[in-house]
C-alpha cells in the first residue's frame, strides 16, 4: 500500500521465530517478490506505474544487489542486525512524524541531476536489497517525490521496482538458502492476500495516514526488541 515492500517487517519477524538471519533475509526477499508482485499487477492495470523511471532504477539496482549480497555474507550478524534496526528506527519515526517528508516534499529535480539521482538511487536500492533484504522501497518513494511524482504514482512505481530489486537480491542469496518449505508457503499465501488488500486500499480514496502510524509503531517496537537483544 505504501510502496516500500514488506521485507522490513518480514526479516525481524522471521528472525524472531528462530530463523538464521541470512535465511530470514532470503525468505523475506522471496515474500517481497510475491507481495510486491501481486500489488504491482494491479498498479500496472490501473496505469499507475511510470516505466520510464522504473526500468533504469531496476537495471542499476540489479548491479547493486550483487554487491549487497556479497557484503551480507562478509558482515557479522550483529552488525547486520544493528544496521537493520537503525533503518527500522528511521523508517518508523518517519512514518509517525513525517519529518524527512517535510524536507523533500515540494522540491523537484530535473535534467542531469535527475539522471544522476536515478543512477545513485538504483545502486542504493540494490545494495540495501542485497545486504538487508528490504527491497529499498523506503528509499524509492521519497526519491520519486523529489523527482516530481505524486504520492500514489511514487508508491506504485516503487512497488514495481521493489519486485525486481528483490528478485535480483534473492538470486544473489538463494544458493545458501535452506528454507522451511511449509512455513514459507503459509507466509506467502498470507502475504499475497494482504498485498492485494493493501493495493486496493491505496487505489481507493481511503487515506493511508492511520496505517502509516500503526506500521511506524510496529517498526519502532521491533527495532527496540532487536537492539535489546544486541545489548543483553
What is the meaning of each model-derived region?
Residues 1-6, 45-50, 147-156:
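Membrane-helix interface "capping/anchor" motifs
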Residues 11-17, 21, 41-126, 147, ...:
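Juxtamembrane transmembrane-helix boundary motif
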Residues 2-11, 132-143:
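Transmembrane helix boundary and interhelical junction motifs in multipass membrane proteins
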Residues 19-27, 52-53, 148-159:
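Membrane-interface alpha-helices at helix entry/exit sites of multi-pass transporters
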Residues 115-123, 142-146, 159, 163-167:
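Hydrophobic alpha-helical segments embedded in the membrane of multi-pass proteins
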Residues 30-37, 63-64, 71, 161-168:
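Membrane-embedded alpha-helical segments of transport systems
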Residues 25-33, 155-163, 192, 219:
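Transmembrane helix-bundle signature of multi-pass membrane transporters/permeases
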Amino acid at each position: 500500500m505504501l510502496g516500500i515492500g514488506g521485507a522490513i517487517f518480514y526479516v525481524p519477524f522471521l528472525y524472531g521465530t528462530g530463523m538464521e538471519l541470512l535465511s530470514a533475509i532470503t525468505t523475506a526477499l522471496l515474500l517481497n517478490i510475491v507481495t510486491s508482485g501481486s500489488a504491482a499487477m494491479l498498479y500496472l492495470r490501473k496505469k499507475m506505474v511510470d516505466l520510464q523511471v522504473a526500468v533504469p532504477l531496476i537495471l542499476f539496482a540489479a548491479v547493486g544487489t550483487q554487491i549487497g549480497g556479497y557484503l551480507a555474507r562478509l558482515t557479522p550478524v550483529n552488525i547486520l542486525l544493528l544496521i537493520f534496526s537503525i533503518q527500522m528506527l528511521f523508517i518508523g519515526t518517519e512514518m509517525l512524524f513525517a519529518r524527512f517528508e517535510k524536507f523533500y516534499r515540494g522540491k523537484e529535480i530535473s535534467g542531469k541531476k535527475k539522471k544522476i539521482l536515478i543512477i545513485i538511487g538504483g545502486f542504493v536500492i540494490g545494495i540495501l536489497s542485497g545486504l538487508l533484504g528490504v527491497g529499498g522501497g523506503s528509499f524509492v518513494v521519497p526519491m520519486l517525490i523529489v523527482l516530481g511524482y505524486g504520492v500514489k504514482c511514487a508508491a506504485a512505481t516503487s512497488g514495481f521496482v521493489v519486485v525486481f530489486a528483490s528478485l535480483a537480491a534473492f538470486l544473489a542469496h538463494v544458493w545458501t538458502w535452506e528454507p522451511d518449505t511449509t512455513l514459507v508457503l503459509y507466509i506467502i499465501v498470507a502475504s499475497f492476500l494482504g498485498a492485494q488488500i493493501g493495493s486496493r486500499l491505496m487505489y481507493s480514496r481511503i487515506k493511508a495516514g492511520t496505517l502509516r502510524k500503526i506500521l511506524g509503531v510496529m517498526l519502532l517496537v521491533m527495532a527496540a526488541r532487536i537492539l535489546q537483544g544486541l545489548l543483553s
